[in-house]
Amino acid sequence: MRPEFIHLRTQSSYSFLESALTIEKVVELASSNKMPAICLADKGNLFGSLEFALCAVKKGLQPIHGVILNIKYDIDIFAQILLIAKDETGYKNLLKLSSLTFTKNDRKICDHIDFEDLIEYQEGLIGLCCYTDGIVGKCLLARNEEQAMLFARKLQEILGDRFYFEIMRHELPEEQFIEDSYIRIAAELAIPLVATNKVLFSEKSMHDAHDVLLCISAGVTKEYLDRKTVSENCYFKSPHEMIELFSDLPSAIQNTVNLRERCYFAAHANPPMLPNFATENISETDLIKKDAKEGLLARLATKFKSENIALENQEALKTEYFARLNYELDIICNMNFAGYFLIVSDFIKWSKKEGILVGPGRGSGAGSVVAWSLLITDLDPIKFGLLFERFLNPERISMPDFDIDFCQERREEVINYVRSKYGNNRVGQIITFGKMQAKAVIKDVARVLSLPYKFADYLTELVPFSAVNPVSLEQAMREVPELANAAKGNGLYNLDGEAELIKLVIDTSLILEGLHRHSSTHAAGIVIAGTDLVDIVPVYKDANSDMLIVGYSMKYSEIAGLIKFDFLGLQTLTVITDCKKLLKEQGIEVDFNNMTFDDNKTYQMLCKGKGVGVFQFESIGMKDALRRLKPDSIHDLIALGALYRPGPMENIPTYIACKHKLQQPDYLHELLQPILEETYGVVIYQEQVQRIAQVLAGYTLGAADLLRRAMGKKIKKEMEEQEEIFVKGAIANNISESQAKSIFATVAKFAGYGFNKAHAASYGVISYQTAYLKANYPAAFLVACLNLELNNHDKINLFLQEAKDNGIKIIAPNINISEGYFSVKFSDTVIPHSVKPVIPRLDRGIQKISKDTVVKPRCDIAGAIIFALGAIKGVTPNFGKLVTDERKARGAFKSITDFIERLPPKSINSKLLENLIKSGCFDELHDNRLQLLSSIPKLLSYSTAYHEEQESNQFSLIKVSSLSPTILVSSDYADKNTLAFYEFEAMGLFISNHPLTEYQEIFSRLNILNTADLHNNLPDGTNRVNLAGVIQKKDSRMSARGRFVTLVLSDPENIFELSIFSEEVLKDYVHLLDVKSLVVVNCDIVKDEGGIKLTAKSFSSIEDAINNKQFELQFYPQNHEELRQIVTLLAARINNEDQSNAKATIYLQSADVKNFVAKITLPEKFLLQGQDFEILKGYSK
């Protein structure tokens, strides 16, 4: 049956924040309405075109490719046109035109093409004049029919019979205003009319939710009237509705069908399109063979020298390595992948030549001898027992995939090299699309609907966070009853008056969730093509970059024929680079190229579980595993990196027990001992599964890789087929059927979690390198770690704690010592563990420094880590450099006014100055932080006045100097706790004083432990403890058991984390769980191989914990002065009301009568605070 109507103006969510339809929904709507075809015409881009085509074809629909573009007709005349691809030429021109809208240099007004662009790329395109948004409609709305006719003729001249007048009926006044004139011009010029309807949502009832989407786009609330809106009729109308709507213009309906019949191209998959690496003189095949053989000779020469291999053994090794090399080369060349290897080898060789650190390998590519020979990887595959077939299987053809790790700071240099070599038009990044996920969509919708912030924050906090698998709103409502109840008016807050609005927020969020919100770029993916990218895919260019971005997501870029190369920036390589640079400045060279992995100091450190900063070994559980494993070889580190994952983790105890000869390894069969010996009988690696199948059942390594894949996927049919092959092969090898089946079942269980050994070995080497640096050069290593985490105050806290544990001094921020980044001062003297962090004095005893005083460092900074100015909130490393350069040029700062006078006023603002003061940067220059904070407005005014006078020719030293004494306002001194929280606000950590320090004496009386007690002094069998801490961070997360909250707290010794799984605990103590709260928590404690786990059961404030306890204090003064101090303090704390928490007895020793002690029980009651116990502890018991 001939179709009745085809929608030609359907937009998807790739029209960012304009359409509420996904590609799948568009196709589903067309299919359910029995349309044989559907046109996708997104606003300004073709980002969804390939996804749309494949989805439509899969559903048996004809995809029609269109795009809505802005055309610049004149200097200030812009209008829309809908262009549709008639054939392949048209589609390629559509790619070029849509790409031009992003790659032009004049995008200030809007993304557009020029009229001349349409003339150049019109072939194969059908054009629809976009009614009221098109040039003809705009002219008619301006009552200029003559100009409308002129532009209609121009477009008709360009497109001929491929030009249509689009007509819509959304019941809008502007449409009705121009309709008659519009139809008349179409008739006069014989331009066919085509009926369309804007399709932005699926049904009329979605109009309100779509309106919210438009508000999100505009950044306004629904109450704001002067904003963009669309008609409620912009939904997917059925053919019947459209026919009825245009019953007076049946030809306009018929033309949708006619237009569809003119289109016969759909975007499709393409074979890989790589640049040709061949030259006139040599083919890719010959070139890779030549380079690989030369490279292997060089690798073996280095190997023989570094490993002291005897001359008589070298020839046999050469034979073995070259046999493997030739085997791999045959496969690579037969698969036509020589060019791929040569491209990767080229940019890695360039990187190494330029001194850019490249990872030893990543993924299965490290299993290739060819890759090793071409310098793509740095692991000897034969030495480490790695398999080529795991990377490139001759029995299952698929593209090889090298993921390359580069030093994070220099990754861009490598990309720029590739662009210069192959051409800017052939190299591009890959686009990614940010979606409206649960937390974000609730916040957006709540803001648009004017839901009070506290309710929006409450709702988003109920949605668990998962970085790997974001939780959908629907899933969150199933798993968090409180979220589902919130819409009904129930929850932690009193929702009276807001229940209906909250329900509307959640309902609307459910509709909008998952739509595309914006575009970004893939973190690592780079494509390199053999032709201009725009010939294959739409391209995009960010306004802030000149590099092309492929307009398809990674999945569809590869389907289109583009080959992705992952240029990954690995932060750890930057740590290694920076650490080696610091050491080189001290004349210390570290060469990892010839490392033998046998440094005792490194393994001794790891055996103690000191994994902070060590690649892969930083988690609590991993550190505990290191302590139990006691690694003594690189193979232990490789195995542990592979085992420490859900599933294989259960085999860690077996591995450890067998290593320490507490248990006999089970090799399953004597033939398998050589394969499983290095892992003590535990099947850890996927390569072991392949070897087992080869040795036991006669598989080729390629076929064994297919077996491994089947075991990993656990597809029943494939597993049954593979088991039959395995058993048959094992029987042929004189193994009984029952034993073969048993071994297959055992291996299948392990294989489901098997890890790629090539990847494990590559990353194990990086782990060893970082451990080596930390063990041998801890200060330089930790500074390198710190400098990559300037904005991560949790990490800074962690690394500084590690430095303190390693006896490294910490210099608090100091405007005359600190630089933009953390820095280290080396010393020949070993700093003992007992050394405490160097901190500024915070009392009134600091000497005030006048403007003329020569400032000297307040401590010996040799062997210390100096806190970075750039790690203070609101302060950038660039500002730190400005300060450092000024110090180098004109010496140390002598006062706060000297600082103000010497730095440009534009570089200093109120927040920056506030945080510099709060962090203690000026403590050496001025002893009263509170006074400086109160004086900020005057300091800034002084800065402006001083520099204005300097810039004028009327600068008066006397006049400005007369201002100086009046800058600082009078102020009291802040107490220690206030100063501590100043530091927390400025740096996210407590560096010179912790708020709980003064409570340590009373905590001992209250049986409240500190974190050091958890590791050292906890009696066996303890399962419940009381801890005190300051809440530093609060997160809501999701586990298999549902939502839970994690708190990060700190005490004077360390930071610690605890979990809250009970909704009742959350509800009862929500008022105590704010960041910066001082709390006592009663919690369950579990010690296992994952480390220490704390689960909160109840909370109390510090004050309540103290005040709810009655203390019986006994004092033993040794002289009159001590007695006077006791009595003075107690007199100030008399409180005979119910709030009291202490009684006191004083024992006086007679000076005349031996062994005579007078006991005086005071009748009064006292209300003591935390600091009181600290003061009195020297006199009491």
From Swiss-Prot:
This is DNA polymerase III subunit alpha. CDD domains: DnaE_OBF (cd04485), PHP_PolIIIA_DnaE1 (cd07433). It comes from Rickettsia conorii (strain ATCC VR-613 / Malish 7). DNA polymerase III contains a core (composed of alpha, epsilon and theta chains) that associates with a tau subunit. This core dimerizes to form the PolIII' complex. PolIII' associates with the gamma complex (composed of gamma, delta, delta', psi and chi chains) and with the beta chain to form the complete DNA polymerase III complex. Its main location: cytoplasm. Keywords: Cytoplasm, DNA replication, DNA-directed DNA polymerase, Nucleotidyltransferase, Transferase. GO terms for biological process: DNA replication. One of its GO terms (molecular function) is DNA-directed DNA polymerase activity. SMART domains: POLIIIAc. It catalyses: DNA(n) + a 2'-deoxyribonucleoside 5'-triphosphate = DNA(n+1) + diphosphate. It holds the Pfam family DNA_pol3_finger. The keyword Nucleotidyltransferase applies. GO terms for cellular component: cytoplasm. Its EC number is 2.7.7.7. PANTHER family: DNA POLYMERASE III SUBUNIT ALPHA (PTHR32294:SF0). InterPro entries: DNA_pol3_alpha_NTPase_dom, DNA_pol3_alpha_thumb_dom, DNA_pol3_finger, DnaE2/DnaE/PolC, DNAPol_HHH, PHP_dom, Pol/His_phosphatase_N, Pol/histidinol_Pase-like. Belongs to the DNA polymerase type-C family. DnaE subfamily. It is found in: Cytoplasm. DNA polymerase III is a complex, multichain enzyme responsible for most of the replicative synthesis in bacteria. This DNA polymerase also exhibits 3' to 5' exonuclease activity. The alpha chain is the DNA polymerase.
